[in-house]
Design a protein with these regions (language model features):
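A short acidic, Gly/Pro-enriched loop at the edge of an enzyme's catalytic core
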Residues: 190-202
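Core SAM-dependent methyltransferase catalytic element
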Residues: 261-282
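A short glycine-rich, Lys/Arg-flanked "PGG" loop and its adjoining helix->strand segment in the class I
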Residues: 216-235
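Class I S-adenosyl-L-methionine-dependent methyltransferase module
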Residues: 3-8, 20-21, 76-176
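S-adenosyl-L-methionine
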Residues: 2-43
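Conserved beta-strand signature within the Rossmann-like core of class I S-adenosyl-L-methionine
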Residues: 236-243
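Conserved class I S-adenosyl-L-methionine
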Residues: 44-52, 69
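Conserved SAM-binding loop of SAM-dependent methyltransferases across substrates and taxa
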Residues: 54-65
Length: 282
């Protein structure tokens, strides 16, 4: 309850590196075209992802990843991610998307006003996760918080590879052997909070915020972030990012003492300039 009612302090908790806050509504779905990311076997890989909607971790698990560390400065993101994962574990393909469609359009966790989704998936939630969502529902019913204080229904489930039944069922199976560890952390601090090194890092468009323009202030922040990440990367590792504006020069602005190979793939069907890019450690 304290966490949920602490949202008004969000303005004091904006990170200095991006405009993200500790208590922002978390996306229900990704707004990236996840099909742009290369399909590779992630079995046995140490993986670090931004939490956000949870879809980067889910995509990694679909591709065989089982050891996922997930971080976000937004403390609501891990709860939204955990709820989606619990629902995937509980429901088959049709029932999952029927309930997600209800959540998205009706903005309620009481499906058809008869089924309390939180209670239905309780066995798949940790004690902390169940307590958060049951408290959220209590406060929402009593008009102390609003649905969109925590869940932002913006996004597009069709951009996820698990929107197809075959992929959904594979993801459901893979989740049985996967573990996600969540960290409440900004990108600049993540190297201080984890105790392992990674093969793959999926950052969504966080680096686009860090390197918002190619001016000295933003370039300095970007170099600090990449230098910090470099400390927790294994040889041959790859950082993946997403860019909605195609303004930032990710390769040109890396510190001279670091060696990374840059590559990118543009979205041909987005209607706007979007791309994924990779920084491969060499």
């Amino acid at each position: 309850e304290k966490l949920l009612l602490n949202m008004n302090s969000n303005k004091d908790k904006i990170t200095s590196f991006t405009s993200f806050g500790n208590f922002d509504p978390s996306y229900l779905w990704t707004n990236e075209d996840m099909k742009l990311y290369p399909k590779e076997n992630l079995k046995g890989k140490n993986i670090l992802t931004i939490t956000s909607s949870g879809d980067h971790a889910l995509n990694a698990i679909l591709n065989g990843g089982s050891m996922i560390d997930s971080f976000d400065v937004n403390q609501f993101s891990k709860y939204v991610s955990a709820l989606k994962i619990a629902m995937i574990k509980k429901y088959d393909y049709y029932d999952f998307f029927k309930r997600m469609d209800w959540i998205e359009n009706v903005e309620s966790l009481n499906f058809n006003s008869r089924e309390n989704i939180i209670d239905s998936v309780r066995k798949y939630l940790s004690h902390d996760e169940y307590l958060f969502w049951s408290t959220f529902e209590y406060l929402r019913i009593n008009n102390k918080v609003h649905f969109n204080d925590v869940i932002n229904v913006y996004g597009n489930l069709k951009k996820n590879v698990y929107s197809k039944a075959l992929s959904y069922n594979k993801l459901k199976r893979n989740l049985k052997n996967a573990k996600i560890t969540y960290y409440d952390s900004d990108i600049i601090d993540i190297e201080k909070n984890v105790n392992k090194k990674y093969d793959r890092v999926f950052l969504s468009n966080v680096l686009e915020y860090v390197l918002a323009t190619n001016t000295p202030h933003f370039v300095d922040n970007y170099q600090k972030v990449i230098s910090g990440l470099d400390k927790i990367l294994l040889p041959g590792s790859v950082i993946y990012g997403y860019d909605f504006s195609n303004v930032s020069k990710y390769s040109d602005n890396i510190s001279e003492h670091l060696s990374y190979k840059y590559d990118e793939a543009s979205c041909k069907s987005c209607g706007v300039q979007q791309k994924i890019f990779s920084l491969s450690k060499v």
